[in-house]
A protein has these predicted regions:
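Short alpha-helix in the alpha/beta-hydrolase fold that links the catalytic acid
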Residues: 107, 214, 223, 237-246
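C-terminal catalytic histidine-bearing segment of alpha/beta-hydrolase fold enzymes
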Residues: 243, 250-285
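Alpha/beta-hydrolase fold nucleophile elbow
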Residues: 153-164
Length: 285
């Protein structure tokens, strides 16, 4: 006959084992649900879109015009073309992930004041642009805008500019062509870096439907490359920009400016940034 204490201990350990297994199962189930939700809504994190009606009227200082392209059925691409009074060329500006040209169009003055036109597209689902989102579609759209621009501007008078998410469009475009220069503000080597920084507890590599492998595309770039990044960037880790810079071919002119107190969206506020950008816009080198 078993000792009563043994029976009590056996029952206790069985209870603990059952509770532990039940807890682990519940945690695993919850983790799976979180992963599923992340996979389902990730576009809302990556692309913070703001739509505008086709009839919306922009109001910016200086001359500008709207450009509409329809490269495929059910796809409408929209951009603003800002004109400088005495032009040195055109900056093809790929903006960040949030808002629309209603917000980003204000940035054009930074270039037009220095004699550069600015062609600034909205991505699919942003502003007046329409179409189904995918990484391949965004890359194709960026190429369409570059091709359109080369019909109006010589390639050696085009600077491709990518701001944060916009680097994911700017780098492949520059890699496939021969613009005057490639300028990247707060860029990433790939989107996995940003995801790891924000969602490190999730299997982000398996869940992400967007990679934006700038670190691979930039190896094919033949024009000068200028990278600006803040060490305190809470969205795109500084180390990601370092990896991107390391991937730039040694055969091209390259420079990386680090801002010790810089965050993600404040780099234009630094005098050093403005000074170097003035040099780039003045010489393209």
């Amino acid at each position: 006959m078993d000792h009563p204490l043994i029976a009590v201990l056996t029952g206790y350990f069985h209870g603990v084992l059952f509770f532990t297994l039940y807890t682990l199962l519940a945690v695993a189930l919850l983790y799976g649900v979180v992963c599923l939700i992340y996979w389902w809504v990730q576009e809302r994190f990556i692309f913070v879109r703001f739509r505008l009606a086709r009839t919306y009227r922009f109001a910016f200082p200086g001359p500008f015009e709207e450009v509409f392209l329809e490269p495929a059925p059910a796809v409408t691409l929209h951009a603003l073309l800002f004109r400088a009074s005495a032009t040195k060329g055109t900056v093809l500006y790929f903006h960040g992930n949030a808002g629309s040209l209603k917000r980003w169009g204000k940035k054009a003055q930074r270039f037009t004041r220095q004699g550069w036109n600015v062609l600034m597209p909205d991505y699919r689902g942003y502003g007046k642009s329409r179409g189904r989102l995918s990484e391949a579609a965004l890359h194709a759209d960026a190429a369409v805008w570059y091709d359109w621009l080369t019909g109006h501007e010589k390639e050696d008078r085009i600077i491709v500019y990518g701001r944060s998410l916009g680097s994911g469009m700017a780098v492949p475009v520059a890699a496939a062509n021969h613009p005057r220069a490639l300028v990247l503000e707060s860029p990433f080597a790939n989107l996995y870096d940003a995801a790891r920084h924000q969602f490190y507890l999730l299997p982000y590599r398996s869940l992400l439907r967007y990679a934006f492998r700038n670190d691979k595309a930039i190896r094919r770039v033949t024009c000068p490359v200028h990278i600006f990044h803040g060490k305190r960037d809470p969205i795109v880790p500084y180390e990601s920009a370092l990896r991107l810079y390391a991937a730039v071919p040694d055969t091209v002119h390259r420079e990386m400016l680090t801002f010790e107190r810089g965050f993600h969206s404040d780099l234009w506020g630094f005098k050093r940034f403005q000074r170097v950008m003035g040099r780039i816009l003045g010489t393209g080198q």
